């Protein structure tokens, strides 16, 4: 996999542009999604941004080598809000390299804008991916107007959905990153089925380690700190410069990384047992009757909150019963049905608090 060196970026200099005296100084502030608490201002520098950019461009070298498509002529459709770090870093990366970036007015106008502005690639969150998937499976791919590369991030994706799209000619790239790392972290450009549940290969721009299962990162993409919040900064940035992501992960010998949950999301039962809600949500994902689900704790029991059609509730109960038979007793789930879609933030992440 090709890596773009820092020197490549510094070569994009023009005589009429004054060089910034300190690339490590704060240049802009992005806010965290606030899925488990209040949103925090993340202080980022130009150095953070430009060292993270290669992670957003490198996968397209893989697209070119694996498909033969001319990615130099690609245009992208940006549907994520600009306060999302992935949207910001992608926009700057593609603009710097001379690509066309089409901006979607609002998500509700997605199909209108995609039809008006032909785009080869787009970053998607689970809700948007599900809509694209439904169109493809219903034989309505013409609505996508040539869209063929999907970069997936912000949450876990159903591997069966990804495989179906790949079987129908889409190139799927998965990503892992945080606002605190300027979106950098890992990219998965492999089209092999065995890697569909991986967020990707660790990135050369950072160092990685696991501390009690928690993924920690250190390197140039890591933030300066939280704006006017030294206490919160000290909770995640240690004295040696390691950023504690809060994500529980494992890294296999081949370098591929797998996320198993969020440290803050872990449910601690009265028995002392720890339960990862994301682990159970993955087990429920294959159920076709489930539109959305979120696992949480209700009265010291594990509860699966499910959004589905009313006539599919029995099918959901049967599926959960089958899953429970494969689990230890303390992980057994009860089902609670929701008539409304589950709450999400603007980036498509479930709001768990």
Feature-to-residue mapping (PLM):
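Gly/Ser/Thr-rich phosphate-binding loop
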Residues: 114, 120-124, 132-194, 207
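Conserved pre-ATP/AMP-binding loop-to-beta segment of ANL
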Residues: 12-31, 37-38, 64-75
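Conserved AMP-binding/adenylation subdomain of ANL enzymes
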Residues: 50-75, 82-123, 127-146
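Conserved ATP/PPi-binding loop(s) of AMP-dependent carboxylate-activating enzymes
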Residues: 201-202, 212-236, 256, 273-275
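Conserved AMP-binding A3 loop
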Residues: 27-54
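Flexible lysine-rich "adenylation lid" loop at the C-terminal edge of ANL adenylation domains
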Residues: 337-353
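ANL superfamily adenylate-forming
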Residues: 1-23, 136-138, 342
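AMP-binding/adenylate-forming catalytic core of the ANL superfamily
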Residues: 219, 224-225, 248-328
């Amino acid at each position: 996999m090709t890596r773009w060196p820092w020197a490549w970026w510094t070569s994009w200099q023009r005589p009429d542009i004054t060089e910034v005296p300190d690339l490590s100084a704060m240049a802009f502030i992005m806010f965290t999604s606030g899925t488990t608490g209040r949103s925090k201002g993340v202080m980022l520098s130009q150095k953070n941004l430009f060292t993270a950019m290669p992670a957003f461009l490198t996968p397209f070298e893989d697209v070119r080598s694996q498909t033969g498509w001319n990615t130099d002529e690609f245009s992208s459709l940006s549907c994520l809000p600009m306060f999302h770090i992935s949207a910001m870093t992608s926009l700057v990366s593609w603009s710097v390299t001379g690509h066309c970036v089409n901006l979607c007015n609002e998500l509700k106008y997605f199909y209108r804008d995609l039809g008006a502005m032909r785009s080869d690639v787009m970053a998607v969150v689970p809700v948007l991916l599900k809509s694209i998937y439904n169109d493809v499976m219903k034989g309505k791919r013409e609505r996508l107007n040539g869209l063929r590369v999907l970069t997936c991030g912000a949450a876990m994706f159903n591997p069966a959905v990804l495989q179906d799209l790949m079987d129908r000619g889409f190139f799927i790239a998965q990503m892992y990153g945080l606002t605190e790392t300027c979106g950098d972290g890992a990219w998965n450009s492999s089209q092999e089925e065995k890697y569909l549940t991986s967020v990707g290969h660790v990135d050369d721009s950072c160092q990685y380690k696991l501390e009690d299962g928690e993924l920690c990162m250190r390197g140039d993409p890591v933030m300066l700190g939280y704006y006017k919040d030294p206490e919160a900064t000290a909770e995640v940035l240690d004295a040696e410069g390691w950023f504690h992501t809060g994500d529980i992960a494992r890294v296999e010998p081949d370098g591929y990384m797998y996320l198993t949950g969020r440290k803050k999301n872990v449910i601690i039962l009265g028995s002392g047992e720890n339960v990862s809600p994301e682990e159970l949500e993955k087990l429920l994902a294959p159920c076709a009757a489930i539109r959305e689900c979120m696992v949480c704790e209700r009265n010291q029991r594990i509860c699966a909150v499910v959004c589905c059609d009313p006539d599919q509730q029995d099918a959901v109960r049967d599926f959960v019963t089958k899953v429970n038979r494969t689990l230890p007793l303390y992980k057994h789930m009860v089902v609670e049905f929701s008539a409304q879609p589950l709450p999400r933030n603007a980036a498509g992440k479930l709001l768990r608090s």
